[in-house]
A protein has these predicted regions:
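Short aromatic-glycine-(Arg/Gly/Cys) micro-motifs in beta-strand/loop hairpins
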Residues: 1-16
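A short, exposed loop/beta-hairpin motif centered on an aromatic-Gly-Thr core
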Residues: 16-24
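Short arginine-rich
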Residues: 36-46
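C-terminal structural segments of small proteins and small subunits
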Residues: 46-80
Length: 80
């Protein structure tokens, strides 16, 4: 098992994950980043009309090796 850090990037900068999580390999860490991104949308899309966040995953080198970005727009149009 390897320790990976899942940093969150948003309009306010980067929120570093200092603790990290254990994953079996880089592919598993990338899959976890996708899950985190989906959860961010699920919990945040109703609070903003535009949602732009990214999860950057760092490995033991402390350098990001993958970024999962989510961009969503919430738009309501009253038709009647």
């Amino acid at each position: 098992m390897l320790r990976f850090h899942f940093d969150i990037k948003d309009g306010g900068g980067i929120h570093r994950d200092e603790h990290g999580e254990m994953c079996t390999d880089h592919q598993a860490a990338e899959a976890e980043a996708v899950k985190i991104a989906v959860e961010m949308v699920r919990h945040g899309i109703g609070q903003w009309t535009h949602f732009d966040r990214a999860v950057e995953v760092r490995d033991e080198s402390d350098e990001p090796f993958v970024r999962v970005r989510v961009v969503a727009k919430l738009e309501t149009q009253r038709l009647k």
